[in-house]
Amino acid sequence: MAGVLCIGIVTAQPRLRQPEFYLGVHGGATAGTVLFMPSESGMSPITKACVLGGNGGFVFRYAGHKYCHFQMELTYEHRGWRQDGVAHNLHYIELPILMHLNFGGEVCRWFFNLGPQIGYCVKDESSTITHPFDWGLTAGTGLLFKTRKAGVYHIEIRYDFSLGGVFGTTVTDKHSMANPMDLSVNLGWVMPVPQKRKLKVESL
């Protein structure tokens, strides 16, 4: 259903005379936790206290349509949870692959990002997790601001929910669910990549 919706949105957009490419960076502050579901029947989900951290990385954006773009990121993200006063800090390298929709005027636009992501825990400070590979969904919304010569700036609120788990979740394990999730506030900047055939930037 989601795939059909995405195809419908893209095909309904006016195409650009020449595809546009953007490169940039982004980063911000995160608040991460883990949603645990005990394996015992009748037990309620347990959300641990948050760990505060940060994220940062690179942004690549392809614009073939005026308001609907394809965006890929390579990001470092600090995740984890706090339990009994002890912080369990996890450091991930993540690859979100997003549909980027934006609406509005020539200078300021509202945007929405949605798509899957995969990641890998490159450092576990507590040496507690058993499943370093991660995958899940990412959704974010915010405002972007276009300048004449200094690129495009944006501010975004983003939510990430892991569909994998940091621990085993089989019937013999302690938890039936151990899913990381985090909320972040990010600032970013992208610049159009120069092309041989110079046309007016139409996507922003």
Feature locations, PLM:
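Bacterial N-terminal signal peptides
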Residues: M1-G8
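Outer-membrane beta-barrel proteins
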Residues: Q13-R15, S44-K48, F60, G85-A87, ...
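Transmembrane beta-barrel strands of outer-membrane/channel proteins
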Residues: V25-A31, M72-Y76, F112-Y120, L143, ...
